[in-house]
Amino acid sequence: MQRLCLSNEQIERLQAIIESKQNCKCQADVSFGTVWITSDDELNELRVSFLGDFELIVSRVGFNHKHRGTMTAVLEELKKICAEVGVPKIVIQSVLTPEMQAFCHAQHIEPDKNTTMQAGEVLVGDYFLMLDS
């Protein structure tokens, strides 16, 4: 298993998307291979990391302004990053809201049958997207 981390350029691309779509200023913190991008007002955040060369994990997402295409643009960038480093899978960890469930469904991101359960109207848990090789 190869240990991967986002490059400074990849982090800057993600940061630029969030700043542009959310009209904010962000900073990125890197710790043990995990990248956490937050806005100065702490209303926007994205946390991503690699699990070796197996998958890229999105473990935290929060954007102040909805329906601006922020997560769609972030997902497209994450797909490019995975292609650059040869990672075949993106995992959206701990989907808890109807909005994120709807986003995953619209983007063909599938619930992991081993880690999801029905909680009211939301199928909570991890969702994954297998990428073309």
Question: In which residue ranges do the predicted regions lie?
Answer:
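Glycine-rich phosphate/pyrophosphate-binding loop shared by adenosine-nucleotide-utilizing enzymes
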Residues: S39-L46, L56
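Conserved acetyl-CoA binding element of GNAT-fold acetyltransferases
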Residues: L51-N64
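Conserved active-site alpha-helix within GNAT-family acetyltransferase domains
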Residues: E84, V95-Q118
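Short amphipathic alpha-helix that is part of the acyltransferase structural core
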Residues: M1-D29
